[in-house]
UniProtKB/Swiss-Prot annotation:
InterPro entries per record: aa-tRNA-synth_II, aa-tRNA-synth_II/BPL/LPL, Phe-tRNA-synth_IIc_asu, Phe-tRNA_ligase_II_N, Phe_tRNA_ligase_alpha1_bac, Phenylalanyl-tRNA_Synthase, tRNA-bd_arm
Catalysed reaction, written as an equation: tRNA(Phe) + L-phenylalanine + ATP = L-phenylalanyl-tRNA(Phe) + AMP + diphosphate + H(+)
Organism ancestry: Bacteria, Pseudomonadati, Pseudomonadota, Gammaproteobacteria, Pasteurellales
The protein, known as: Phenylalanine--tRNA ligase alpha subunit
Cofactor remark from the record: Binds 2 magnesium ions per tetramer.
Annotated EC: 6.1.1.20
HAMAP family, per the entry: Phe_tRNA_synth_alpha1
Class of enzymatic activity (EC top level): ligase
Length: 328
């Protein structure tokens, strides 16, 4: 116990003698409380004390140790505050200067395109519709006049869960569900994710589509052409040369693919369209003798690539901030 008293007194005197300096405090802590410190060695000597005396002596050592630590911590806190005050006093702060700019995120280029397309058609009276991404073969194929032998049903194109369920390959199922639950006139725009088993520079297994459906008593191809002309001019913000090429889609008749002339003089396909096939109208209980309709389907990534001159579709899904920051 005499040794403990002497050690405590020595530690107090050493602390009092320290000049201001955090490094000196750390050296003191290591000397007295480190692995080979004086108080650590004193605690290890308890093994030589009888079991009856050990608790009382151990308590006294801990009490003395804590008293020194309290002084050490108080001195450290005071010196740290003094150092901070000195640093602040030496710094010149102009409170009239603007604060640091907060780094803000931005919309993904695909989201920007979806918003632009939806905004255009919403202003024309179209409402946004959506549907499930896990679809049945009826809504993805049968109701759209796609026969069982159609190549789109093959495993190399479609992700099947079982014989009836799949990841939708197109957003056209939204059109069927809408026509089942609404009476004409119908005007919808349906953006969403779709899935096809393909991956290269111009294809990814997941991508985005936007489909347009208009059903009314006097819907016709002339209206469809005018609508597409106006949309492409607004989307690309230039008076583009547009052409319609005859094509085939099981769910529209007649059908067309739409190309635009780019600055390099080449035609580029941007979307597909056509008049809703009478069989599709019959499948949802709409009389094709009374009503007609037209549909438009476009790939969002393709539109985005053309608008921003992106050459690799996969860039949209690699989360490279150097690429994405260009669209803020």
């Amino acid at each position: 116990m005499q040794h403990l008293k002497e050690l405590t007194e020595k530690a107090r005197n050493a602390l009092d003698a320290l000049d201001q300096g955090l490094d000196a405090l750390e050296e003191f802590r290591v000397e007295y409380f480190g692995k080979k410190g004086h108080f650590t060695a004193l605690m290890q000597e308890l093994r030589n004390v009888s079991a009856e005396e050990r608790p009382a002596i151990g308590a006294k050592i801990n009490e003395a140790k804590q008293a020194i630590l309290d002084i050490l911590n108080a001195k450290k806190e005071a010196w740290e505050q003094e150092a901070l005050n000195a640093k602040l006093a030496a710094e010149s702060i102009d409170v009239s200067l603007p604060g640091r700019k907060t780094e803000l995120g931005g919309l993904h280029p695909v989201s920007i395109t979806i918003e632009r397309v939806v905004k255009f058609f919403s202003e024309l009276g179209f409402t946004v519709a959506s549907g499930p991404e896990i679809e049945t073969d009826y809504y993805n194929f049968d109701a759209l006049n796609i026969p069982a032998h159609h190549p789109a049903r093959a495993d190399h194109d479609t992700f099947w869960f079982d014989a009836q369920r799949l990841l939708r390959t197109q957003t056209s199922g939204v059109q069927i569900r809408t026509m089942e639950n609404m009476q004409p006139p119908i005007r919808i725009v349906a953006p969403g994710r779709v899935y096809r088993n393909d991956y290269d520079q111009t294809h990814t297994p997941m991508f985005h589509q936007i489909e347009l459906l208009y059903v009314d008593k006097k819907a016709n191809f002339t209206e469809l052409k005018g609508l597409i002309h106006d949309f492409l001019k607004a989307f690309f913000e230039e008076d583009l040369q547009v052409r319609f090429r005859p094509s085939f889609f099981p769910f529209t008749e007649p059908s067309a693919e739409v190309d635009v002339m780019r600055q390099n003089g080449k035609w580029l396909e941007v979307l597909g369209c056509g008049m809703v096939h009478p069989n599709v109208l019959r499948n949802v209980g709409i009389d094709p003798e009374e009503y007609s309709g037209f549909a438009v389907g476009m790939g969002v990534e393709r539109l985005t690539m053309l608008r921003y001159n992106v050459t690799d579709l996969r860039s949209f899904f690699e989360n490279d901030l150097r690429f994405l920051k260009q669209f803020k």
